[in-house]
Each structure stands twice: as structure tokens, then as C-alpha cells.
Amino acid sequence: MGGGAEMKVRYNKLWKLLIDKGMKKSQLREAVGASKSTFAKLGKNENVTLPVLLNICEYLECDFGDIMEAVPENEV
């Protein structure tokens, strides 16, 4: 491939969006039917399944770019 830095996902935008909406992580987790372990993965910027991300976006009425970003691995 391109030989550049490996990219990782960061979910900081999701946490900021929740703050802006006055919502707790637990409220979102329950609303979208996600497990505690899935939200632990989000908190550690680990991979989660696409259906989980789709449910979050649908509930928050936003797009993927509003809740996550791809950054070089050394910035995660």
C-alpha cells in the first residue's frame, strides 16, 4: 500500500457531541441497545461493529464523521 502511518479510529467527536446534547454515555448505550463492553471499546478507541455505529448515528441524527475520525496511530 502507500507505506504511510497506519490509521486508527478516534471517537472524541462522539463524546463531545454527547456533552453538547447534555447526554450521558449510559443513556446513549441504553438507547441504542449496545453492551457495556462495546462502549468500553469506544472509550478506548477500539474497533466496534458497523451496526453499532449506524445505530448511534441514527439515534443522534448525525453521520459517521460527526462521531469519529481516522487519525495516524501515533495520535490515538
Q: What are the roles of these predicted feature ranges?
A:
Residues 1-26:
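A short, Lys/Arg-rich alpha-helix, primarily the initiator
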Residues 18, 29, 43, 57:
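The alpha-helix within a helix-turn-helix
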Residues 33-48:
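Recognition helix of helix-turn-helix/homeodomain-like DNA-binding domains
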Residues 42-43, 60, 71:
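DNA major-groove recognition helix of helix-turn-helix
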Residues 52-66:
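DNA major-groove recognition helix of helix-turn-helix/homeodomain DNA-binding modules
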Residues 67-76:
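Short amphipathic recognition helices of helix-turn-helix/homeodomain-type DNA-binding modules
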